[in-house]
Amino acid sequence: MAGVQTLGRARGSTWTWRPVARDVLLARAFHSCTELEGRFYLVGGLLEGGARVPSNDTVIFDPAVGQAVRLVARGSPLRSHHDAALVGGRWLCVVGGWDGSRRLSTVAALDTEREVWEAWAANPGNCPPAGLSSHTCTRLSDGELRVSGREGGTHTQRRYGSIYTLKLDHRTRTYCYKEEGCHTTSRSGHCAALLPTAGPHPGHQLLLFGGCNSVGPEVAGQWSPGKIKEEQPVAPHLREQLARLVSSGQGLQQGPQSLRHHSCSVVGPFAVLFGGETLTRARDTICNDLYIYDTRKSPPLWFHFPSTDRGLKRVGHRTCLWNDQLYLVGGFGEDGRTASPQVCILEFFI
């Protein structure tokens, strides 16, 4: 493990990303990063800007000790611009993505106990989308995901505005897509957040942020109280810090416009968005802004906390919640080509 470089605090800033680890194995963008039993599983991604073929390696990062190791596992797939989700507390399912020659809608699963990759089969009733990349997969329950968005040409505009439910069965090693009746604005490089609705009997809604010329989130699913059993990680201290941060800001009705390839993590009633690439500028397109979407009241409010530290600019990165801390992993920096080898945690000065 190489030494950790200190970025420091930008003058007047109320927050920063503080480096806690550094390893060349972590340097990648457009990868997936999934927490399982206190370890982060990084799958695939691009190792440098302009790379045509994605990585096929899997790296495990242990945040408790700050160490990363490459997992040697048979059948590791070439993937970037994919998404991943856990099934059965054991199988890390990688959904879709770019393999260097085409977009896929197939499912590859890492059996984390046997450390072997498996190619799962489609059920006979499978109705898959066109190949997926820069899409999102959101867990609704163990073995059920909501899939939205994808990259593609204009002739497939309607289809990549479609929403799919993806059922995953680890017992039979199979999957099945079902197209939902609703559609959204076509988008890619967006993020998705399953958030509680305001009120005395909160249900849930799935919101899509960014990935198109839009300033507000779009609803990709709504569920009445008690329908969603998926439990978010408990992060009481981080939630308190976010509440204090937004209390110091000015709430807005509109969020960031035309943002893509940013990160998003749900912390209680807050969606925490960071970085990404803006489509509103021809130059200096990679961002280092922190946005908080606060759903505690109706209507929800946006809070924007910019940074003057250009070293924090990221695109194609991931954030991951563990042990009451929000971690930033990978991504390309300001030049859009150099992958960051650092792991950072979100730190506040309030």
UniProtKB/Swiss-Prot annotation:
Coiled-coil features, chain-numbered ranges: none
Keywords, comma-separated and alphabetical: Kelch repeat, Repeat
Task: Spell out the residue ranges that the record assigns to Kelch repeats.
Answer: 39-89, 91-137, 325-350
In its keyword annotation, does this UniProt entry include Chaperone? no
Q: Name one Pfam family in it.
A: Kelch_KLHDC2_KLHL20_DRC7
The record's SUPFAM superfamilies line, in alphabetical order, gives: Galactose oxidase, central domain
Q: A Gene Ontology MF term for this entry?
A: cyclin binding
> Known InterPro entries for this protein?
Gal_Oxase/kelch_b-propeller, Kelch-typ_b-propeller, KLDC9
- Tell me which PANTHER family the record gives: KELCH DOMAIN-CONTAINING PROTEIN 9
Q: How does it assemble?
A: Interacts with CCNA1.
Descriptive protein name = Kelch domain-containing protein 9
Gene name tied to this protein: Klhdc9
